[in-house]
């Protein structure tokens, strides 16, 4: 994993795993809404009533509908399950 993806991939993966609804703003101002179904180095698959493949180079901002907690390097799955860590 390259240094550029050290924050992006865990962030997108948390949004995907927790099925957090997101608003994605494109560089041309268009707002897309849905849940992140999948992603790779170049695209995000956004699911709403239909699935849309959105190229990352066209994305300006990803806004989750609620706050998300990113796992840090020392976190374990057990720590995420404890009350008060949400």
UniProtKB/Swiss-Prot annotation:
Superkingdom: Bacteria
SUPFAM superfamilies according to UniProt: Sm-like ribonucleoproteins
Cellular-component GO terms for this entry: cytosol
Signal peptide: none
Presence of keyword ATP-binding: no
Residue intervals of the Sm domain: 9-68
GO biological process, any: regulation of DNA-templated transcription
Key word RNA-binding present: yes
Keywords: RNA-binding, Stress response
Chain spans, region Disordered: 66-86
GO molecular function: RNA binding
Subunit record text: Homohexamer.
Record-stated family: Belongs to the Hfq family.
Function according to Swiss-Prot or TrEMBL: RNA chaperone that binds small regulatory RNA (sRNAs) and mRNAs to facilitate mRNA translational regulation in response to envelope stress, environmental stress and changes in metabolite concentrations. Also binds with high specificity to tRNAs.
HAMAP family recorded: Hfq
Descriptive protein name: RNA-binding protein Hfq
Organism field: Ectopseudomonas mendocina (strain ymp)
Gene name per UniProt: hfq
